[in-house]
């Protein structure tokens, strides 16, 4: 939506309560994420990085939901849109959320990016549109494969809680 999302202040309240103390869409998303089979996170490129809104949102979503294991082994991908440059840096930024939370990253034919200043220009980016179509196909396939594995009784690897190196080393 268009509602403002404040950034994470690192207070740790979500570690104790399972919810962010801020009352906005983040807690609702984390609750819905529990039932989701997969995720695609997207952003326009702003100064060779993700928009402040998506960065604030994902910081808080993964700080709160990540601590609860909400995203573990749920397929995910990042997509970005730019007028010209900064896409790979932005993808790297978004992909870190996925990689740091045990989420299988869904592939496509190339980097998950499109180019254009407006929707019409993006639709004319034939390569980018093909990448998005293949990403959607691969996402659907991976989610079906995971569901079939669960139905067949194939055990998931054991999840290990994250070990944190003490700060005073």
Predicted feature descriptions by range:
Residues 104-169:
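Glycine-rich phosphate/pyrophosphate-binding loop and the adjoining helix
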Residues 6-10, 53-54, 117-121:
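Short secondary-structure transition/capping segments
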Residues 3-4, 49, 114-115:
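Short secondary-structure capping/turn micro-motifs that flank functional sites
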Residues 5, 23, 51, 88, ...:
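Electropositive phosphate-/nucleotide-binding environments in soluble metabolic enzymes
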Residues 2-33, 160-169:
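Cysteine-cluster motifs in flexible loop/terminal segments that predominantly coordinate metals
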